[in-house]
Amino acid sequence: MDSSAITIFVLLLLSIYFIATFWVFFDRYYIINSRISSEARSLKALYTGQSKSVASNSLIFTYLSRVTTPNKAILQAASSDAIRVSTKGLTWLSIIAATSPFIGLFGTVIGILETFSKLGSQSSASLSVVAPAISEALIATAAGIAVATFAYTFHLILKRKAYELSSLLASQSEVILSQVEE
């Protein structure tokens, strides 16, 4: 492989993006899923009357334990804070999904420019000389698209999981507020 320093840098950057994408996904997926399980158990206990308040491992428990009478503003603040903390890293997935195809394309353009530059200095240019160089340059675009596909897919999965968590927290808040009103 006779790649330029820029092409190698582009592929290295895309490799870092790839690792970061999987790191953020698995980390956040585990955290959000465990919180969903915890909040679902807490909500079930509220619905069935096993408990008059959220479980102590609930994300909104800390907020509720500080006030004598829960109100909508406190519960919304608790829910918003829990979602904010749970979805850390989603912005990075968006950035990676949006930028990696362009980074890959940049690597391809540089590779093709270098190929044409080398061809200009040679006396003959046959397909056997041009094709391997151009196919090597296209690897950067393929890598960028692959990284973007994973990042975008993982972003959507985590966004859906965050919505599930938000719904559970909202349901718990509604049950708690209805108990206060009684």
Q: Where do the language-model regions lie?
A:
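Membrane-embedded alpha-helical segments of inner-membrane proteins
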Residues: S15, S121-S128, A148-A151
